[in-house]
């Protein structure tokens, strides 16, 4: 019986060896081996631990790297003289209180093991007086070090170092949601960053004599560096514009889909989630009602408001429901219009003044027109027209994930005829019951990534590359799927018809004329949006999408600020400042006061 088992074992090992790579310099277990001999298949780790790859921005500035770090661990008992400890480390009393508050998960956590990260100068002080402080434990170990305080949702964390955060998150109901959605690039590309150790797979007999390998050896490989699409300077600048406010800002290069800036507000330092001495700050993030740990641009889908009029106009042009010269009365018996303006005699004027009644009638033309084949059945016509509208709108990458490299991307939502049949409890719903779609309200939900990508599609006249955060892996390029061009179902000529109206938005009389960059020679094309909040106490949400330069776009931006009021006064200024910063490298003097006022409000969180 044992002989039969040995024969079976040798045959299996021979088969595995035969499947090994032909360039592997190993010997196999031949069938001529003595079947009475028992062999042991081993897996032996080769010397060397792979270095984790670095994260670099688009200009090759290092954002995250693995470096030595010094930790000072305090004994839980007896309590130390904190003022004396502060003198030892060169800290004043305010710094001592702040560092202890940051290191403890909650006030009064006296027995919590406190650790402090130290600078080289502080380490020298501790070593010099170590005899007087025998209970202090100083250690050195390699850790991920962030060279920037910006980009938390982009950079994310290495889960091995984020265990304290993950442990704190498990103890809160909201934290269980956060811990799956904040890994960023460190989590998404972990396998490439980590590299892998080398392993040999020797086959030995009972006396330990080698008999080749039982499978292919694994080669040692260092972790690969990731070259991000992010512009670190632009990212830091954009975060100052949002600060403590709830919302997001996403900036893309429409020509490539590369994400230039990705802000989720309120902003926080990425090192907070992994630093051993910031348990208190992590607790504040987890418990905050403003939900700073929510990755808003990717995981939160909201009604887009009036910026969605651009999509509805493009679909209506494609399907022949309107033409560029189509005009409608500003009939406020249909829907209110918050802007006083001339009669929208064509699409350009309708976009310039964001006339709600104009786009109510555009969408009505789309939904209520009855094809000849359905002339006697308006119910069927509405169902067919809504389904057709949805098919064209979905080609913008909506109602589905874009396939970006941000963890847990949400798909957003577009209603179907079946959805309304169920919601209205009848198939005989009318356009009047779904007209909110015409102004980007109601059941439509888009993510920030989708909003920015929508602007990029219009900038490109109908095509896009999926938005992504990594432009190069090691010495290579991005993941192959980010090089695949996607096209909408809208002809390019119809996107060109939107451009005059989008330019007019930022010209005299337009809804965002104050945000014009004409003084520095930059023509911006954009669209403002004010999203109804639905609550009685809070302000509406502010939105803006646009791109610049209008005729040769190099940057597309989407901004969404919760409870900030009008898109023209809150969102548009942030967007154009980011455009100007990226295209010129500086802000014109006439907008410096404007910039300071926005940043001041951002620091105060409103």
Predicted regions and their residues:
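Periplasmic/cell-envelope proteins involved in peptidoglycan metabolism and beta-lactam response
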Residues: 2-15, 19-279, 301, 324, ...
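Beta-lactam-recognizing serine transpeptidase/beta-lactamase-like catalytic domain environment
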Residues: 64, 204-215, 255-307, 311-564, ...
């Amino acid at each position: 019986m044992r002989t039969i088992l040995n024969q079976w074992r040798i045959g299996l090992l021979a088969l595995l060896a035969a499947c090994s790579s032909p360039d592997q310099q190993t010997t196999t277990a031949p069938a001529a081996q003595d079947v009475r001999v028992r062999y042991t298949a081993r897996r032996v780790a080769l010397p060397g631990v792979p270095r984790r790859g670095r994260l670099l921005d688009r200009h090759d500035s290092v954002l995250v790297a693995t470096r030595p770090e010094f930790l000072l661990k305090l004994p839980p008992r007896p309590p130390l003289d904190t003022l004396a400890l502060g003198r030892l480390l060169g800290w004043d009393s305010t710094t001592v209180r702040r560092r202890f508050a940051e290191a403890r998960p909650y006030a009064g956590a006296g027995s919590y093991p406190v650790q402090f990260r130290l600078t080289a100068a502080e380490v020298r002080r501790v070593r010099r007086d170590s005899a007087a402080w025998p209970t202090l434990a100083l250690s050195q170990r390699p850790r991920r070090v962030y060279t920037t305080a910006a980009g938390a949702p982009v950079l994310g964390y290495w889960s091995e170092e984020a265990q304290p955060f993950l442990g704190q998150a498990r103890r809160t109901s909201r934290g269980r949601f956060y811990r799956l959605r904040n890994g960023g690039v460190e989590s998404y590309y972990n396998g490439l960053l980590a590299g892998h150790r080398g392993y040999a797979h020797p086959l030995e007999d009972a006396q330990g004599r080698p008999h080749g390998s039982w499978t292919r050896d694994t080669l040692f490989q260092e972790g690969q560096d990731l070259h991000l699409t992010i512009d670190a300077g632009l990212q830091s600048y954009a975060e100052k514009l949002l600060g403590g406010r709830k919302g997001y800002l996403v900036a893309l290069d429409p020509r490539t889909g590369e994400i230039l800036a990705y802000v989720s507000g309120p902003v926080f330092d990425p090192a907070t989630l992994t630093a051993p001495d910031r348990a208190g700050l992590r607790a504040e993030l987890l418990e905050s009602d403003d939900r700073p740990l929510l990755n808003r641009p990717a995981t939160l889908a909201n009604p887009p408001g009036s910026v969605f009029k651009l999509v509805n106009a493009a679909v209506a042009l494609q399907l022949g429901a309107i033409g560029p010269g189509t005009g409608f009365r500003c009939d406020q018996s249909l829907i209110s219009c918050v802007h006083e303006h001339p009669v929208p005699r064509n699409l350009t004027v309708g976009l310039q003044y964001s006339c709600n009644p104009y786009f109510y009638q555009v969408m009505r033309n789309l939904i209520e027109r009855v094809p000849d084949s359905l002339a006697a059945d308006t119910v069927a016509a509405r169902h067919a027209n809504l389904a057709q509208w949805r098919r064209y709108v979905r080609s913008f990458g909506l109602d589905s994930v874009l396939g970006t490299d941000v963890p847990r991307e949400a798909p957003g939502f577009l209603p179907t005829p079946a959805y309304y049949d169920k919601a209205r409890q009848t198939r005989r719903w009318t356009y009047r019951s779904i007209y909110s779609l015409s102004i980007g309200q109601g059941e439509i939900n888009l993510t920030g990534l989708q909003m920015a990508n929508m602007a990029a599609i219009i900038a490109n006249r109908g095509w896009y590359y999926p938005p992504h955060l990594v432009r190069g892996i090691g010495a290579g390029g991005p993941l192959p799927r980010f090089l695949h061009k996607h096209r909408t179902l809208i002809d390019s000529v119809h996107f060109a018809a939107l451009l005059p109206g989008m330019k007019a938005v930022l010209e005299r009389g337009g809804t965002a004329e104050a945000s014009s960059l004409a003084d520095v020679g930059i023509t911006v094309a954009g669209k403002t949006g004010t999203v109804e909040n639905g609550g009685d106490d809070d302000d509406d949400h502010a939105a803006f999408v646009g791109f610049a330069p209008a005729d040769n776009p190099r940057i597309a931006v989407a901004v969404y600020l919760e409870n900030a009021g009008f898109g023209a006064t809150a969102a548009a200024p942030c967007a154009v400042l980011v455009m100007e910063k990226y295209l010129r490298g500086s802000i014109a003097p006439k907008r410096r006061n404007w910039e300071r006022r926005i940043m001041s409000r951002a620091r105060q969180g409103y």
